[in-house]
């Protein structure tokens, strides 16, 4: 199926405030389907935790809505002198809770929620399906039903330690999904390009092994010839490839009955 990027870019979302922190409003942007949805896909942008915005994944969220799901793109606090990934994770947890509430109010039912994240956003997407990490933020938070991890960061103990202001080994491991997998975590689709020079493919394989050891259902799909951030339009790959990959993910989620 050909994905019409231009049409997706011309689709406008509804904006919702999900929390206010120190006077700063944080928003999520929702695209609604024309039919009764089976599920919701929450898209989380990358940018190394220091740049980019929710708008980056508007076309992807709009596509999920076009295919019958509620598509959402969320913003979160970027790292700064006073914030790190713990703040961003707190925001993402708050956003999921607010989105679930909105979905129930709008449709009168609960539905599967999928976290879909690219790179640094993949980190947050994975965290949202990880029981230990979510409970550190909110004891009452229910993890997402499924995770789509697109070349996501899973280990803060090496080159990605800058994501956390604390550099103690204990804290770095506590906020690394790789070291916090447990039985009952959300089933996961891991997708990683074999030409990724930003987040090492080996990290995806290590995470797959960690999930396997704990009996967490998952699929690891290695994309031949794909570089980092292969899901972004107008970036490293041509838009035909990006669209085909997005359509494949959508079909995969439909096959799993999440959307």
Where are these predicted regions, by residue range?
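Catalytic nucleophile-loop/oxyanion-hole region of alpha/beta-hydrolase
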Residues: 52-60, 72-111, 236-241
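Short beta-strand element of the alpha/beta-hydrolase
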Residues: 38-47
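Conserved alpha/beta-hydrolase "acid-adjacent" motif
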Residues: 197-206
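C-terminal catalytic histidine-bearing segment of alpha/beta-hydrolase fold enzymes
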Residues: 212-259
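N-terminal cap/lid segment of alpha/beta-hydrolase-fold proteins
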Residues: 1-36
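Active-site nucleophile elbow and catalytic-triad environment of alpha/beta-hydrolase enzymes
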Residues: 166-180, 185-186
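Primarily recognizes the serine-hydrolase "nucleophile elbow" in alpha/beta-hydrolase
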Residues: 97-162, 172-173
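Short beta-strand/loop motif that positions the catalytic acidic residue
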Residues: 184, 190-192, 196
